[in-house]
Amino acid sequence: MSGKDFLQKLLDGERVEWKALGEVAEYAGARIDPGQVNQENYVGVDNLLQNRAGKTHSSYVPTEGRLIEYRPGDVLIGNIRPYLKKIWLANQSGGTNGDVLVIRRTHPSLSPGYLYQALSDDKFFAYNMQHAKGAKMPRGDKAKILEYQIPIPCPDNPKKSLAIQSEIVRILDTFTELTAELTTELTARKKQYNYYRDRLLRFEDGEVEWKALGDVAEFRRGTAITHEQTTTGDIPVVANGPTPIYFHGESNRQGETIVIARSGAYAGYVSFWNQPIFLTDAFSIHPRADILKPKFVYHVLQNKQENIHAMKKGAGVPHVRVKEFELYDVPIPPLAEQARIVAILDKFDALTNSLTEGLPREIELRQKQYAYYRDLLFSFPKFPSSVGVPEGRSNAGDA
């Protein structure tokens, strides 16, 4: 069945009217005292999670001022940096501040779940960014947000409209629930992976020899390069983070390479590359082949990633120094044992991190299915209503 046929069957001959958000919803305006909230029901922009992942408990609860009240069924949206896609369908009552929009339905032909799905669409976040104000810390325009159009099936027949919306929400919830289950399982597997990694890389006193990295490996600094100096090519330019900053036509590292980000927020980040790369604001570690396998050293360092991040120095732009890594002690079991450990950890790593196999791949596929069906289920023919946003509605709930 084509997407068009599916929608026609779902609507069963009913019309769809596109309405401005301000015609069917409003900003909550009621205020509550700080004493009425706690870490569980206070929602600030910082404890709304990116990419539609809901919310987590707040580490901070205000003690003064008045808070915006939210209720079950309200949609809360982080209004700072809209591109982070912070959105949550409230299942409880609580309070928030002016950095979070509380959107409450007012139309009888609109369900909270349907409103949440409509505002979870990438098109909404793109619209919000398009009209956002501020360069460094963009903030959504509240008046423009209320002009955003959402489709309402047969708005003059609330019973039929809510039934159609319920079916749309049911279909989309099926994918989100499955993704949540897979994510929970992936979290459990990562904990299991970390446990086995700790066990495999834990050696008793006297079991193996330990040496400073500077005695058993060569350290090489990256080469400065600007984007303007790059030539056409597909070789990753690796610097101070987990992903390439751009691509180049030449490489300065070949084969298995351990990379340590030198400066910035990711200073000390350990990564492993087994392809030609161009290394810039970072340094690479090259162990002696007769006693250490590069991938084994990578796993040893990656297992201590938190400790390595703690080695950062500098108040402005944090950085790590080669000489500190040269003094870092690593175990040196026999090469055959290193190979065995690497094989086990690589398999675990693929199952928990690879986007080509295992749970990460399954989660990615479910997310793509969800996005496909969300786009399909909201791709109604666009016949906007002739009614504008009710006067004054856009100012409700201003902080």
Language-model features, listed with the residues they occupy:
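Charged, alpha-helix-forming regions
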Residues: 1-399
